């Protein structure tokens, strides 16, 4: 088993979970800042937004998780703040971040669809990297299996939990997000085929479909009325994206890159 603590500095400990999130964040900011000028924004617009949105998104992700696990946290109130042990719900962070984005764009007089298109591939890459935080914490896994011989030994060893090998759903989602990121980056090189909102719509459909399937493999999902919460959200986001694409193309929306 890999030590979840990357290193210690006196009484302070830096967990691999945090390292994965921070690496994903830095790469996401770099990619978004690089793309911003092509959408008539500045890198400062991106950085200022991140400084506001990131801490709020972490808080939102934690609140989302705690809310659906309140039966546990109501009896262990001190654990609510122990985010280094895991328990950050991605959808909670995305919902919070999106709300902050619309408020930020309103006050900065920026186009929120432009901002979402810029953010989508960056977020997808950050999610691909961030999922490895679940690997180090031994969470977000699936049912017990007899062997995982198709995986490298370090993953097999880390996925040996409670006396059994576990389906590495974190890895499936990480790879799914990475593939989606590559598709967007290639697609973005052909702007004539793109309209404003196509990138964020693709993200919602791609991530939503992947999460819908992979979530069904997990054994530690947040539940609501006997169904996994993330599956509810995934279906909703897929429907929203499909409706948005249909309306946008029917109305012959604005091209992704404007001269």
From Swiss-Prot:
* Secretion signal span: none
* Thylakoid in keyword set: no
From the record, give the transmembrane residue ranges. Answer: 12-32, 46-66, 83-103, 109-129, 167-187, 194-214, 226-246
EC numbers on record: 2.5.1.145
Q: Under which pathway is this protein filed?
A: Protein modification; lipoprotein biosynthesis (diacylglyceryl transfer)
- Give the chief site where it resides: membrane
The protein's UniProt keywords, in alphabetical order, are: Cell membrane, Membrane, Transferase, Transmembrane, Transmembrane helix
| Top class in the EC scheme | transferase
Compartments annotated for it: namely: Cell membrane
A Pfam family (short name) is LGT
Q: Tell me which InterPro entries the record gives.
A: Lgt (IPR001640)
What family is this protein classified in? Belongs to the Lgt family.
> What protein does this entry describe?
Phosphatidylglycerol--prolipoprotein diacylglyceryl transferase
Q: Where does this protein come from, organism-wise?
A: Streptococcus equi subsp. zooepidemicus (strain H70)
Q: What is the lineage of its organism?
A: Bacteria, Bacillati, Bacillota, Bacilli, Lactobacillales
Gene this protein is translated from: lgt
């Amino acid at each position: 088993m890999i030590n979840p603590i990357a290193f210690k500095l006196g009484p302070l400990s830096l967990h691999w979970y945090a390292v994965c999130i921070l690496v994903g964040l830095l790469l996401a900011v770099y990619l978004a800042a690089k793309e911003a000028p092509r959408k008539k924004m500045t890198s400062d617009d991106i950085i200022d937004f991140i400084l506001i949105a990131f801490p709020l998104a972490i808080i939102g992700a934690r609140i989302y998780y705690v809310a659906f696990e309140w039966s546990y946290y109501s009896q262990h109130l001190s654990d609510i703040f122990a985010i280094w042990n895991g328990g950050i719900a991605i959808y909670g962070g995305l919902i919070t971040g999106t709300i902050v984005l619309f408020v930020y764009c309103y006050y900065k007089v920026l186009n929120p669809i432009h901002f979402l298109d810029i953010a989508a591939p960056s977020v997808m890459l950050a999610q691909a990297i961030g999922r490895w935080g679940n690997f180090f914490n031994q969470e977000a896994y699936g049912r017990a299996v007899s062997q995982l011989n198709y995986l490298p030994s370090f993953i097999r060893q880390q996925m040996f939990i409670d006396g059994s090998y576990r389906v590495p759903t974190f890895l499936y989602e990480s790879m799914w997000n990475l593939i989606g990121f590559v598709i967007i980056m290639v697609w973005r090189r052909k702007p004539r085929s793109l309209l404003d909102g196509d990138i964020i719509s693709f993200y919602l459909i791609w991530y939503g479909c992947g999460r819908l399937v992979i979530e069904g493999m997990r054994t530690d999902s947040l539940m609501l009325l006997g169904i996994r919460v993330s599956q509810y959200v995934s279906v909703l986001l897929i429907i929203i994206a499909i409706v948005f694409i249909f309306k946008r193309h029917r109305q012959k929306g604005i091209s992704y890159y404007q001269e």
